[in-house]
Amino acid sequence: MAKPFLKWAGGKTQLLEEILSRPPESYSRYIEPMVGGGAVFFSLASRNNPPESVINDLNAELINAYRQIKANPNLVIEELQALAQNSETYYHIRDAERSPEFLTWELHKKAARTIYLNKLGFNGLYRVNSSGFFNVPFGKRSGIDFNSTNILAASEALQSCEIMNVSYVDILQHILPGDWVYLDPPYLPINETSNFTQYTAGGFDITDHRALRQFCDTITERGAKFTLSNAHSNQIIELYSNYNISVVFAKRSINKNGARRGAIPEVIIRNF
């Protein structure tokens, strides 16, 4: 069974059972406009008779990794195995994108870089600065297993999947009646210390969440089903008050303060 090949902020591994125990009675395709680490997608894709799928993310680096694992998994694995696991190599690889030569890198090498930085970076964070450059420090780890077996399994799971790199709004034109759309946006922060939205150089604020609610309304009008995950907050509850809301608990592992990692309430919102 394929699993996410990256550790991703907001990843849904801890919520898989809650999400997948609440599917539509029937659906024709599975669409994920904000795929991130892809825990839900990989779980569905690894089942018998997996649904036709479309995954998308605005993060071009992430989508390149998906596309290269789909098309060239062995080349990605070879690149990963050739990289030393130490701070000197880490910072050399991390800062390579600041050089004009980075534009000449082959796409599978860039994909390996993404995975390498994710596995060896501090706490598995993906964070960029205002210029769009990855700026996570070395995590002081070695002996990391890049799990080539899982990369190959992920490649197999992706073979029948369409992979896109556009704004989630642009996915709307591809959504048809009978589709099941799973939305996992950057969560609305529930306090001043929990605002982590740097998946790309831009953030995701309350205005974006209101626009996402309108997106969900359009999905509903189109005759498709949606499931959405978000933080348990009064703003989110009010925003989606006309939909089916379930409160669940998830254990979060990406937090700079280890003492704050643990089970926290979240919501699963559905139009069915």
List each language-model region with its residue ranges.
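Conserved acidic-Pro-Pro-aromatic motif
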Residues: 178-268
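Short His-Asn-centered micro-motif
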Residues: 33, 56, 164-166, 183, ...
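Short, well-ordered beta-strand micro-motif
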Residues: 116, 268-271
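Short, polar loop motifs at secondary-structure junctions
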Residues: 36, 150, 230-234
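SAM-dependent nucleic-acid methyltransferase catalytic core
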Residues: 1-15, 25, 70-196, 211, ...
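SAM cofactor-binding core of SAM-dependent methyltransferases
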Residues: 21, 26-101
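Short, glycine/acidic-enriched loop or turn micro-motifs at the edges of active sites
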Residues: 35, 60, 170, 187, ...
